[in-house]
Amino acid sequence: SYMLDAQMLNGYDRIVSDEPFFSFIITYSGHGPYTEEQDTISAPHLARARAVIDYSTVPYTTEAQKEEYTRAVAQAMETDAFIGGEWLEADGHAEDTVLMLFTDHYCKYFSDAEFISAIKGETDRNMLSNVPFVIWTEGIAPQVYDKYVSTMDIAPTIVDLFSLDADLRYYIG
């Protein structure tokens, strides 16, 4: 078991090969609660997160909100460090790699739902569930699609993008 996304990189050389491969990684670092309970994850990044928060325009109204938000940012920094991709460039895999990143839910672990609504500028709880899905590969210009999709769309998207041989009757999405 692991707590830090960075620990997964310790096994990178066992995952990567010169042959095409697929790896599915679920990270834990961004999950709440955003309290001292998750210090293993947030502590390495707290000082930097505090510096960022001090210059932000996030509309917190209490020190407790500020601390919880700061810890969430620190935990996100752990995942950012893992996703950074320097390791792909260092071993020459960046040009033949596709990264797909998605979250399964919004930051529902915050103790104050109204605070999250204020940050996102959205009060409809259903709309708060809109989460990003990112597909990255070297040399492709960034694009934004604002269509509503679901996690059930990911597998058919992968099949289509890579022209995989698949019986689409068994896929929904």
Please state what every model-predicted region is:
Residues 1-173:
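Solvent-exposed soluble domains appended to multi-pass membrane proteins
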